[in-house]
Each structure stands twice: as C-alpha cells, then as structure tokens.
Amino acid sequence: MSNFLTYVKEHQNRFLEELFLLIRIPSISADSAYIPEMQKAAAAVQEALAKAGCTHTELCPTEGFPIVYGEKIIDASLPTVLVYGHYDVQPPDPLDLWDNDPFDPIIKKTALHPDGAIF
C-alpha cells in the first residue's frame, strides 16, 4: 500500500491536471447547445482510458450521446471488473449564484472544489 500512496503523491499534479481537463468541459447533456462539448468530453474520456492503459477503447454511438468503452484484458480467465460512470454535468444556471466559474476548478485549503462536479 505504501508504494501505491507514494506513486499517487509523486503523480498528484498530473492526476489533478487530467481531472481539471475534464471538469473544464461544459458537458451539459440537458442543453442541445452543448452537443459539441458532450462529444469533446466523450473523446477526452476515451483518451484518458487509453492513457490509463486500456488496450481497446471505443466511442459507441447511441440515439443520444456516445457510450465510452475501454477494456484491458490481462487474463481472460480472471474475473471482469466493470467501472460505470457518466461524463455529463448538470446545467449551472443561474450563474449569478456561483462563487466561481462552475467549469474552472479551484483548490481551496488543499481540497478540490470543482463547482461543476461532485465528489
């Protein structure tokens, strides 16, 4: 476990930048004006999966926004692990109620506060 924690600490800045890249994309699926941003977010997630070591990634078309799929088969006889999530966000309106830009993550008191994301 200590090797893992050391690795995370050594690469923390890179991890944050990769996370911030996604948070900065206003991927608002409820508003058709943001269709290009949804496509951009899907492509960014696909790229992140590839960088994380997935040997196969794919954008699977749907009637709405694409499903982002990635896999890495280490040994077909081992159990499968599935990670499921979403890459869209809620509309930030009304904007005047935000203290900060909802798509510009900031770090306060060493804690991440991306107003456009929930952790």
Model segments located where?
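Active-site metal-coordination/substrate-binding segment of hydrolases
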Residues: L78-F119
